[in-house]
C-alpha cells in the first residue's frame, strides 16, 4: 500500500539498534523524516539485508545519535530535554517507569507517541483470534506494558500502541525460526510440545516497521491499540514444514517428536521457543486504520530469514548448537517418534 503523504517530521526513536527499531529507522528515513536515535550506543550499527553500503552510510549521516541510559532519568532529561520532536517512538520500554521519563519530556509537546507493546498481554482465551479490547492478563510477564498503556491513557498522551505477536526476520536476536532452521540443518528431529496443532501468529519485521511508520500523520490512531502480525497463523507442525520448505528441503520428510513438557526438567534451558497455546491475533483494525497490509506471507518471510540471516550466522559460526534438551526428549523411551502432516486430514 502507498504510504500517507506527510511532510517530513522530527522523530525520536528510543532504541533502534537491535532488531525492530533498526527496520523502523530505515523505513522512517526512507520516507524523508528527520530521525534521532537515543540509546546506550553499546550495539554496533548494522546494515540491513539488501541495503547498499552507500545507502547505509547515507542513513547514518542523516541521522542524529544521542547516547544515554533511558533508566537514568536525569541523564535522559539532560540529553533530550531541550530537543523538540513531532513523533516519539518508544521501542524498548518494559515497565511504566521506563516510559514515564519520556512522557514527562514529550507527553504534552509531541503530536504523536508510538509505544511498542506486545500481544503477550492478552489473557489466554477460549475464543480466538485475540482482538483489541479482549481481556488482558495482569499477571502476564508483559504486565509492565499493560501498566504503561494505562499510564499513557491516564496522562492524556496522544499515544498509539502496537501489539505484535512473534516478530521474525533477519537480525532477530530471539531465535524463533532459527530454532527450527538449526535443527533441520543438523538433521535433528524437531521436538514440539503438546499435540503440535497449536496455532501461533508471526509477523515479519519489515511489515511491522511499515505498520509503525504508517502511524505518522494519522490522527485517528491516537488513543488506539493495534495488533500486528501476518494475516494468517500457523500450527507448530506447520511452521516446521514451512521452515523446511524455505531451506529447500522436502516438507513431508520433516520428522517431529511430540512430548509432554511436564515429563521433563530442563532446568533453566528453554526447550522450545514459543508458548504452548493458541496465540494469534486479528489485524483487521490495523489494516483499516493504518492503510496497511503485510507484504510477507510466511513462505516468503521464512525464506528471507533463512537466506539473509541463518546462512550468514552458520558461515560465521554463530549458531547455538546446544541440543541437550532435544536429546533428552529424543532419547526418552516413553515417547514415540512420529511423522505428521502440517494440517490434519479431515474425515
Tell what function each PLM region has.
Residues 56-72, 87, 92-94:
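Rossmann-fold cofactor-recognition segment
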Residues 175-180, 194-216, 223-224, 238:
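Substrate-positioning beta->alpha
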Residues 81-128, 143-154:
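NAD(P)-cofactor binding segment of oxidoreductase domains
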Residues 11-33:
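N-terminal Rossmann NAD(P)H-binding glycine-rich loop of SDR-like oxidoreductase domains
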Amino acid at each position: 500500500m502507498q504510504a500517507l503523504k506527510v511532510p517530513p517530521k522530527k522523530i525520536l526513536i528510543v532504541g533502534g539498534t537491535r532488531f525492530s527499531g533498526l527496520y523502523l529507522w530505515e523505513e522512517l528515513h526512507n520516507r524523508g523524516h528527520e530521525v534521532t536515535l537515543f540509546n546506550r550506543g553499546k550495539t554496533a550499527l548494522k546494515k540491513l539485508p539488501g541495503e547498499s553500503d552507500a545507502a547505509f552510510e547515507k542513513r547514518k549521516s542523516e541521522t542524529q545519535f544521542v547516547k544515554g541510559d533511558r533508566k537514568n532519568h536525569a541523564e535522559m532529561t539532560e540529553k533530550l530535554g531541550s530537543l523538540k520532536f513531532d513523533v516519539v517512538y518508544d521501542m524498548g520500554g518494559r515497565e511504566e517507569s521506563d516510559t514515564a521519563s519520556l512522557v514527562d519530556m514529550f507527553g504534552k509537546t509531541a503530536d504523536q507517541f508510538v509505544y511498542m507493546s506486545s500481544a503477550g498481554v492478552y489473557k489466554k482465551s477460549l475464543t480466538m483470534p485475540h482482538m483489541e479490547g479482549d481481556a488482558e492478563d495482569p499477571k502476564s510477564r508483559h504486565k509492565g506494558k499493560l501498566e504503561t498503556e494505562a499510564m499513557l491513557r491516564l496522562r492524556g498522551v496522544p499515544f498509539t500502541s502496537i501489539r505484535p505477536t512473534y516478530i521474525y526476520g533477519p537480525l532477530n536476536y530471539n531465535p524463533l525460526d532459527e530454532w527450527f532452521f538449526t535443527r533441520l540443518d543438523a538433521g535433528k528431529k524437531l521436538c514440539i510440545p503438546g499435540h503440535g496443532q497449536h496455532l501461533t501468529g508471526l509477523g515479519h519485521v519489515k511489515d511491522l516497521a511499515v505498520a509503525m511508520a504508517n502511524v505518522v500523520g494519522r490522527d485517528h490512531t491516537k488513543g488506539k491499540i493495534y495488533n500486528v502480525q501476518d494475516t494468517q497463523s500457523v500450527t507448530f507442525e506447520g511452521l516446521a514444514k514451512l521452515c523446511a520448505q524455505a531451506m529447500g528441503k522436502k516438507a513431508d520428510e520433516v520428522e517431529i517428536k511430540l512430548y509432554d513438557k511436564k515429563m521433563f526438567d530442563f532446568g533453566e534451558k528453554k526447550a522450545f521457543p514459543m508458548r504452548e497455546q493458541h496465540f494469534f491475533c486479528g489485524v483487521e483494525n490495523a489494516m483499516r486504520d493504518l492503510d496497511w497490509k503485510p507484504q510477507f506471507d510466511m513462505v516468503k518471510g521464512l525464506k528471507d530469514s533463512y537466506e539473509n540471516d541463518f546462512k550468514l550466522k552458520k558461515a560465521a559460526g554463530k549458531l547455538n548448537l546446544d541440543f541437550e534438551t532435544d536429546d533428552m526428549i529424543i532419547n526418552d523411551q516413553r515417547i514415540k517418534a512420529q511423522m505428521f502432516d502440517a494440517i490434519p486430514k479431515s474425515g
